[in-house]
Amino acid sequence: MEELLSPKELSRLLKVSKPWPYIMVKRGLLPCYKMGKVIRFKRCDVEEFLERSRVERRG
């Protein structure tokens, strides 16, 4: 089974604010898994999100 991250772990890993994971889920940009009131993120989904969000540098 793949590693699941809590919103707190994800925000620490990516060095973003604590609400950021919830905002991305609400916008439909980051998939999550709900187990009752608890949400978790698959590491591979986070990596795919980061690849899609990548900005190519021009210059």
Question: Where are these predicted regions, by residue range?
Answer:
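Polyanion-binding surface elements
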Residues: 1-20
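Short, solvent-exposed alpha-helical "recognition" segments
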Residues: 27-33
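A short, Lys/Arg-enriched interface patch at domain edges and termini
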Residues: 44-59
